[in-house]
Regions:
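Short beta-strand segments enriched in hydrophobic/aromatic residues
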Residues: 11, 42, 53-54
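A short beta-turn/loop motif at secondary-structure boundaries
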Residues: 39-45
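Short, low-order "capping/linker" segments at domain edges
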Residues: 85-95
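An amphipathic, aromatic/His-enriched active-site/gating alpha helix that lines ligand/cofactor pockets
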Residues: 25-37, 52-86
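Short glycine-/aliphatic-rich beta-strand segments at the starts of folded cytosolic domains
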Residues: 1-11
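A generic structural motif
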Residues: 46-52
């Protein structure tokens, strides 16, 4: 089974290009095992990271993602007190 994750974020003014470049680098790292495919989508002032991965790698890959988020959090605006800097959505990919 494969999982699809969409992580929504909104860079602070002046950090958009740097954040997108950093995200491109992160999602292409070879140590991200279990990744089947990945994309970056932009719309208006938001950036969406879209990743398809093997379901059995979801937990370990999510931990890598949180470590990465901690390195770029200063570049992101908070959505609200609950979601904070990202709005994630993950579910089973139906083919």
């Amino acid at each position: 089974m494969e999982e699809l994750s969409i992580i929504r974020s909104k860079p602070k003014p002046g950090h958009y290009g740097k954040f997108v470049k950093s995200l491109k680098h992160f999602i292409s790292l070879p140590d991200r095992k279990g990744i089947v495919d990945s994309f970056i989508m932009t719309k208006d002032e938001e950036v969406f990271s879209i990743v398809v991965r093997h379901a059995d790698q979801l937990e370990s890959d999510s931990k890598q993602g949180l470590k990465y988020l901690n390195t770029v959090r200063h570049m992101l605006q908070e959505y609200n007190e609950i979601d904070r800097h990202t709005i994630p959505l993950t579910g089973d990919l139906v083919e």
